[in-house]
Amino acid sequence: QGGALSVVASAFSGLSKKCYVSEPSYCCLHKRLELGSGVFGAAKDYLRRYPEYTDDALDTLTYFDINNIVSCLKIPTDFCLALADPVCLPEFVYSAYAHVDAPKQIHIYPFVPHYTPEDYDYFVHSEFSKL
């Protein structure tokens, strides 16, 4: 949730100078629900038992989907994309990145699972020292 929170805080606070996004799990929520990946496995099971709530659930999830919030970013944004992440699927993270309508950069890490690579941590720390 940290990656998603950085987007929300940066998009709506008006205080951020730059947004750093690593492992934003709240991308393409309708697809995550369909796949049942991560925390959405329980929600998928629930909707399988109670399909009459599916439309309401999908409508509500759109409010929390980072893909619908990144367009509010007006500051430079930096994404970390781990290609072997089974939780924050790379294609979903890239989709959020593609929706950013501000100066943006993406750091791609092949073979990296669900964690922030040390190299990206160093990059972010060096950037903070410049702000």
Residue ranges and their predicted role:
Residues 94-131:
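C-terminal catalytic histidine-bearing segment of alpha/beta-hydrolase fold enzymes
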Residues 73, 78-81, 85:
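Short beta-strand/loop motif that positions the catalytic acidic residue
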Residues 83-88, 114-115:
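Acidic catalytic loop of the alpha/beta-hydrolase fold
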Residues 8-52, 108, 116:
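Hydrolase active-site cap/lid region
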Residues 53-69:
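Active-site nucleophile elbow and catalytic-triad environment of alpha/beta-hydrolase enzymes
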Residues 1-9:
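Glycine-rich nucleophile elbow surrounding the catalytic serine of serine-hydrolase chemistry
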Residues 75-77, 89-98:
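Short alpha-helix in the alpha/beta-hydrolase fold that links the catalytic acid
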